[in-house]
């Protein structure tokens, strides 16, 4: 059920980027952008989703546990030192390991796609300010 809700939300965000001119702004006869930003947003979402799914195993958060001599091992060591010898349940390292070990690539991909979309909107708003 949660996956359907997230998927519907992402579809809504994609359709929202396709909406024309915002209220109160004049429509330009010629635009430097050939479209509504849909393809650019889709590119950011695809890259974000792909990096999120491939990123956790690349950092060392694998299904078999945290890989030795990896970024994940360093994060686990730092977390244990800062917390008096143990990694806290529900902390960043534990959450990332849970996502990496669970193989929840759909949820991770959706989160990455959402982050890609947020990056697209942020960069798009900065271009509008200039």
Swiss-Prot record:
Places the protein is found: Mitochondrion inner membrane
Gene Ontology biological process terms in this record: apoptotic process; cellular response to virus; defense response to virus; innate immune response; intrinsic apoptotic signaling pathway; negative regulation of apoptotic process; negative regulation of extrinsic apoptotic signaling pathway in absence of ligand; negative regulation of mitochondrial depolarization
Keywords from the named record: Antiviral defense, Apoptosis, Immunity, Innate immunity, Membrane, Mitochondrion, Mitochondrion inner membrane, Transmembrane, Transmembrane helix
Keyword Cell membrane: no
UniProt topology in membrane: Multi-pass membrane protein
Alphabetized InterPro entries for the sequence: IFI6/IFI27-like, IFI6/IFI27-like_sf
Sample GO molecular function, one term: molecular adaptor activity
Keyword Membrane: yes
Subunit-structure text: Interacts with CIB1; the interaction is direct. Interacts with the chaperone BIP/HSPA5. Interacts with RIGI.
Family recorded in the similarity comment: Belongs to the IFI6/IFI27 family.
The protein's name in its UniProt record: Interferon alpha-inducible protein 6
Organism: Pan troglodytes
Gene: IFI6
């Amino acid at each position: 059920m949660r996956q359907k809700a997230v998927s519907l939300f992402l579809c809504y965000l994609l359709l929202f980027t396709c909406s024309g001119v915002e209220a109160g702004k004049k429509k330009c006869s010629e635009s430097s952008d050939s479209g509504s930003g849909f393809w650019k947003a889709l590119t950011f979402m695809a890259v974000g989703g792909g990096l999120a799914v491939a990123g956790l195993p690349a950092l060392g958060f694998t299904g078999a546990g945290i890989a030795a001599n990896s970024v994940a091992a360093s994060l686990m060591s730092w977390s244990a030192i800062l917390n008096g010898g143990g990694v806290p349940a529900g902390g960043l390292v534990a959450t990332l390991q849970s996502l990496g070990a669970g193989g929840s690539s759909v949820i991770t991909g959706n989160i990455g796609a959402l982050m890609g979309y947020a990056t697209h909107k942020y960069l798009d708003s900065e271009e509008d300010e200039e």
